[in-house]
Amino acid sequence: MIQVLTNNPLEARFSFFPAPVNNKKPSKVMTLKDAFGYITGMQARERTQALRRIGDKKEARAYKGTHFDYVTFSGEFSYGADDKLIRHSGLLCVDFDHVADVAKVKEMLLGDDYFDTQLLFTSPSGDGVKWVVAIDLSQCDHRTWFKALANYVRASYGLVADPSGINVSRACFLPHDALVYVNSNVCPF
């Protein structure tokens, strides 16, 4: 049985890994509030702008992998691998790559009636969306939640989720996004 620290997204904890992506040793534990601060802060602003100026896909992928810090939204890890999960956060990050209209996708997901968005931001490349939602692991496991959510967004919105999100240790690169959405329960303003 996977240990879950809490079912309260406010208390969810997950691992932070400094770049590059082949670094599998986390340096600290973060919260959604910490991730919001990082994404809206200046840590990744220059590298996000630089990545978006790169025209070659292969070069852009290499740049992202060497320059961007990342988190594992679904939990705390002793090492960046599924079998090194310490505890699940109760969060799931769904990645939508190469969408035609980022603003429209964000609007649809924020208006969803079934899933309460915890964090929503534009991907480092600028043409994708990262959607972090709370899941209840007492109902089913991480992989089943991912499959259900992927099927749901495809049927409801015609969106295709990146299938790698099925892995609990999936890396999520942290870009700069001044327009990131954070649930008001996480950061009340």
Language-model features: where?
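Detector for Asparagine
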Residues: 7-8, 22-23, 151, 167, ...
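Short, glycine-/Ser/Thr-/acidic-enriched flexible segments
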Residues: 99, 179, 188
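Short C-terminal domain-edge/linker segments immediately following a structured domain
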Residues: 123-127, 161-166
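Short, conserved secondary-structure transition motifs
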Residues: 132-138, 163-185
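Residue-level detector of short coil/turn "hinge" positions at structural boundaries
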Residues: 116, 160-161
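Signature for HUH/AEP ssDNA processing cores
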Residues: 1-127, 135-143
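Generic detector of isolated residues embedded in canonical secondary-structure elements
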Residues: 93, 128-130, 148, 173
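Helical (often loop-to-helix) elements that flank the catalytic cores of nucleotide-handling enzymes
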Residues: 105-108, 135-159, 182-189
